[in-house]
Curated annotation (Swiss-Prot):
Cofactor: Zn(2+)
Entry-linked CDD domains: DEXDc_SecA, SF2_C_secA
This protein's name: Protein translocase subunit SecA
EC nos: 7.4.2.8
Main location class: membrane
Gene behind the chain: secA
Residues annotated to bind ATP: 86, 104-108, 511
A Pfam family that the UniProt record links to this protein: P-loop_SecA
Length: 906
């Protein structure tokens, strides 16, 4: 029924394309008029549009003329004319949607249309790419168009200093990576002077490879952190002990003889000790002198030991060299599971990275304390309008819409796509599969057809490379180990008979041109003459035609990825802009996707039915594979959705803190803010000792006097005052306390330079807020890590998390207010020079902070899905009863007052 309706009225996508085609016709009708304009007249259009906006006209009304202006500027500066389908893509992006455009359809040029239009407002436009190379390349390629029209262009890359960043953000259009934009946002919210902040408003963002950034990267938060205590000895110890543990093949075993020390869950990348394993590791720790004879790992004080043990167990049993990571320059470098790229600077959390460092025998870096963090999901939601481009978004359309409110529109290709997609071939073993791939490659290159082989891991690419070398087949390898050669390898990938092996081609960002990249060849010539260029072009045309006759670029996939989208990205490298091309995937029943997610009975039947070297290639198996991929995609979507629900709690708190902090930073004078805080603190302190509406017998005036003296340097004999006048009520005493705190501050500052006082007050506010926020993030991390254990008490972990996170936040705000007023009361107010020196010292003390796109994919999976984890990673003392007063004994049992123990601010 649905298909019948769609045939009659067309799909939603078709109706949208038909609707915007009318706008395209309007733009096309303006082309002859704009062609007649002189350069000066065309440039003047920018000023005209800005004036019209200032007079109340809206961007939608300006769109046809603005797009016609950019198209004409492209023709004059780059000899590039925007196709009609590119105009459609530009309209989609302006409307805050995702444009799915096939590889080679010119997404970089498309972005100039909405970027120019939205930059007319003066609020800036951000264009996000997946790496620094693409950010620089795209900005340089398109800067001629923008600058011709009077628009400034900036680029944010990793090695810029703060002043250069500020200048780049001040430009009309700023290119950069998602990491750099996100980290600059976090750093701006750690600045101590307004002038140190580099970003301005987050108005409109265009995200290239939007599916990669908003979906693949969604589970990996940006984290700014500082080093915590060194624990390398413990990691080295457990790294030495874990190899003695034996792996159990499955979770449940039929008899005790089959029981081993641990088992793994490959779906969630977790490893679990059995009871036998616990006993074995306990005995080893006792022999090492780490555990006492009567001690056990279940004791609360051994929680940290379990942390090291679990991290090392996972490092040894689940993470493999050259698949999950590589060792480069004596450092562990994570490999992105989606793109195959090495990601220097990114670290796994929860001690996993340190465990792998111990495993590989490199220096163990200290675990880090989070100082600021945000997920891409919540960072990009800060923009007024989001748009995205990609070659493969349709399979993720539901997630993009449900989480980000982004509609996916499939843009028609400029020329018909004529790629031939062959059925998958499935073999019984990995070796048989690789042998078949080598034979296929040999046959194709014999007729001059270039081949791109996509692999899922470095290990697979190196195995295949070894087999090709044995057959004396020349080839290039592109993986995380050869990333420096990427551009030159891709430039040659379309040569007749060339073979290129690439680990996960997703996000490579460079088109493979049949016959080779002509522009690269010309650029490599030194002072070429017109004759040299003409000869190069003629040779390229011959090669281009030869490759087309051979069938175009052939894509061979060595296995299916977990995500159909990644497979489609690999396929999409062939048959660009109407060129011929082919694609084919080779699989084995030992591939991870089929081994983990296909049923065991299915795998056994297929293996039995295949004799040595035989393969299956029919539609039924394609359905099995598609179903397995659907399971994985659904599984990962649930993880991302779950993570977002948890992170939204912290995100709400982050917004409150950052807005409050920004108001402190922008205020010339924070004395009114402090006056309000002093009132809150006086109220808080008073009711800690005099419960609201209570009888006199419950008042602790002596405790209140001691707190005033120790925390605020105030001598106030409340007991004497009450004895002299027992008509004094609760409100009267509260007023006395409030006035005493206010008078003390006025007396302390009345003879000091007001400028120095104001500067010191602002510094104290910012420093105290940062300290408390950092400690709060640590508490939230601990809460998040252990909250799933609430399931044992028949409580919903998510609701418990929201409730307790709110309580922690409220307590943090109370403590912040109390400590900042207490500190100002006890500290001598510094001179302006001393304050500046203190600010400098504080910032120098934070100079070791690291900006990391911390890979918590697998660790968050563990927290989100494993409701049955037996041992919490941390133990946190948490209030179950009435609020603990600052002078009460700390609930942890240390014997100290709460304010000097867990209520203390370092």
């Amino acid at each position: 029924m649905l298909s019948l309706v769609q045939k009659i009225i067309g799909s939603r996508n078709e109706r949208f394309i038909k609707k915007v085609s009318r706008i395209v016709q309007k733009i096309n009708s303006l082309e002859p008029e704009f062609e007649k304009l002189s350069d000066e007249q065309l440039k003047a259009k920018t000023f005209e549009y800005r004036e019209r906006l200032a007079n109340g006209e809206i961007l939608d009304n300006l769109l046809p003329e603005a797009f016609a202006t950019v198209r004409e500027a492209g023709k004059r500066t780059k000899n590039m004319r925007h196709y009609d389908v590119q105009l459609i893509g530009g309209i989609v992006l302006h409307q805050g949607k995702v444009a799915e455009m096939r590889t080679g359809e010119g997404k970089t040029l498309v972005a100039t249309l909405p970027a120019y239009l939205n930059a007319l407002t003066g609020d800036g436009v951000h264009v996000i790419t997946v790496n620094d190379y693409l950010a620089k390349r795209d900005a340089e390629l398109m800067s001629d168009i923008y600058e011709f029209l009077g628009m400034s262009v900036g680029v944010i890359v990793a090695d810029l200093n703060p002043q250069q960043r500020k200048e780049a953000y001040a430009c009309d259009i700023t290119y950069g990576t998602n990491n750099e934009f996100g980290f600059d946002y976090l750093r701006d919210n750690m600045a101590y002077e307004k002038e140190q902040q580099v970003q301005r408003s987050r108005n409109y963002v265009i995200i290239d490879e939007v599916d990669s950034i908003l979906i693949d990267e969604a589970r990996t938060p940006l984290i700014i952190s500082g080093a915590s205590d060194d624990s390398s000895e413990m990691y080295n110890l457990f790294n030495r002990l874990v190899p003695y543990l034996e792996k159990q093949e499955k979770e449940e075993v039929e008899n005790e003889q089959e029981q081993r020390d641990f088992y793994v869950d490959e779906k969630s990348k977790n490893a679990y000790l059995t009871e036998k394993g616990y006993a074995k590791i306990e005995n080893m720790l006792k022999k090492e002198g780490i555990l006492e004879e009567d001690d056990n790992l279940y004791s609360p004080h051994n929680i940290t030991k379990m942390h090291y043990l679990n991290a090392c167990l996972r490092a040894h049993s689940l993470y493999q060299l050259n698949i999950d990571y590589i060792v480069r320059d004596q450092e562990i470098v994570i490999i992105d599971e989606s793109t195959g790229r090495a990601m220097p600077g990114r670290r796994w959390s929860d001690g996993l990275h340190q465990a792998i460092e111990a495993k590989e025998g490199v220096k163990i870096n200290a675990e880090n304390q989070t100082m600021a963090s945000i997920t891409f999901q919540n960072f990009f939601k800060l923009y007024n309008k989001i748009a995205g481009m990609t070659g493969t978004a349709d399979t993720e359309a539901f997630e993009l819409h449900s989480i980000y409110g982004l509609e996916v529109i499939i843009i028609p290709t400029n020329k018909p796509m004529i790629r031939k997609d062959h059925h998958d071939e499935i073999y019984g073993s990995v070796r048989e599969k690789f042998d078949a791939i080598v034979e296929d490659i040999k046959e194709r290159i014999s007729k001059g057809q270039p081949v791109l082989v996509g692999t899922a891991s470095i290990e697979a690419s190196e195995v295949l490379s070894t087999l090709l070398k044995k057959k004396k087949i020349r080839h290039n390898v592109l993986n995380a180990k050869q990333h420096e050669k990427e551009a030159s390898i891709i430039a040659m990938a379309g040569y007749p008979g060339n073979v290129t092996i690439a680990t996960n081609m997703a996000g490579r960002g460079t088109d493979i041109i049949l016959g080779g990249n002509l522009e690269v060849e010309i650029a490599q010539l030194e002072d070429p003459t017109p004759e040299d260029i003409a000869q190069i072009k003629a040779e390229w045309l011959k090669r281009n035609e030869a490759v087309k006759k051979a069938g175009g670029l052939c894509i061979i996939g060595s296995e299916r990825h977990d995500s159909r989208r990644i497979d489609n990205q690999l396929r999409g490298r062939a048959a660009r802009q109407g060129d011929p091309g082919e694609s084919k995937f080779y699989l084995s029943m030992d591939d991870n996707l089929l081994r983990i997610f296909a049923s065991q009975s299915m795998a056994e039947r297929v293996k039995k039915g295949l004799k040595g070297g035989e393969s299956l290639a029919f539609g039924f198996m394609s359905k099995v594979i598609s179903k397995a991929q659907g399971k994985v995609e659904s599984y990962h979507f649930d993880i991302r959705k779950n993570l977002l629900e948890y992170d939204n709690v912290v995100n709400t708190q982050r917004k409150v803190i950052y807005e409050q902090r920004q108001s402190f930073l922008e205020a010339e004078d924070v004395s009114d803010i402090l006056a309000d805080i002093r009132i809150d603190v006086a109220e808080q302190l008073f009711h800690d000792y005099v419960p609201a509406g209570s009888m006199h017998e419950l008042w602790d005036l002596e405790g209140l006097e001691k707190a005033l003296k120790s925390d605020f340097m105030i001598e106030l004999d409340l007991q004497k005052l009450y004895q002299e006048d027992d008509s004094l009520g609760e409100e009267d005493l509260k007023k006395l306390v409030r006035e005493a705190i206010e008078i003390e501050f006025v007396e302390k500052t009345k003879n000091l330079d007001s400028g120095a006082v104001r500067q010191f007050e602002k510094f104290s506010l910012l420093q105290s807020l940062d300290t408390h926020w950092r400690e709060h993030l640590s508490s939230i991390d601990h809460l998040r890590n252990s909250i799933n254990l609430r399931g044992y008490a028949q409580k919903d972990p998510k609701n418990e998390y929201k409730k307790e996170a709110f309580e922690l936040f409220s307590t943090m705000l109370d403590n912040f207010k109390y400590e900042v007023i207490s500190s100002l009361a006890k500290i001598r107010i510094a001179t302006e020079e001393e304050t500046q020196r203190a600010q400098q010292e504080w910032q120098e003390s934070m100079s070791d902070i690291k900006a990391e796109h911390e890979s918590v994919i697998d660790n968050n999976q563990r927290h989100d899905e494993d409701e049955q984890e037996e041992t919490p990673k941390v133990q946190q003392v948490r209030r179950e009863g009435p609020k603990v007063k600052r002078n009460d004994p700390c609930p942890c049992g240390s014997g100290k007052k709460y304010k000097q123990c867990h209520g203390k601010v370092e």
